[in-house]
Amino acid sequence: MGPGMVGGYGVAPTAPAGTSVRMAGSRFEPATITTAPGQIVRWFNDDTAAHTVSASDGTWDSGNLPPGASFERRFDVPGTFPYVCVYHPGMAGTVLVTAP
């Protein structure tokens, strides 16, 4: 593995500290996360129900995430990226990507 690469044989990739969002109690924790361009945000379903992580504008979607599943997405450009769980009205979050 070279510098900056994530993962390895038999090892699940992990997001850098501060770029993880937990799904529990039918909410995203934290509801808003701030990161830099090029970073990966990881969502982990720590709930007893399935969820999705779906861009509010429809441009990306995790698909069904059963309990224990996770989803990762890299954000390359600065901006505000709201998302929702399509199964649970009111379950929403935002990724803020700020220039360094």
State each model region's role.
Residues T19, H51-T52, G93-T94:
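Extracytoplasmic/periplasmic beta-strand context in beta-sandwich domains
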Residues S26, F44, V86-Y87:
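Short, surface-exposed helix/turn micro-motifs that flank interaction/cofactor sites
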Residues T14-P37:
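N-terminal edge beta-strand
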Residues A31-A49, F71-V77, P82-Y83:
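Beta-strand cores of secreted/periplasmic/IMS beta-sandwich domains, seen most often
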Residues M1-G7, L65-P100:
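Extracellular/periplasmic metallocenter environments
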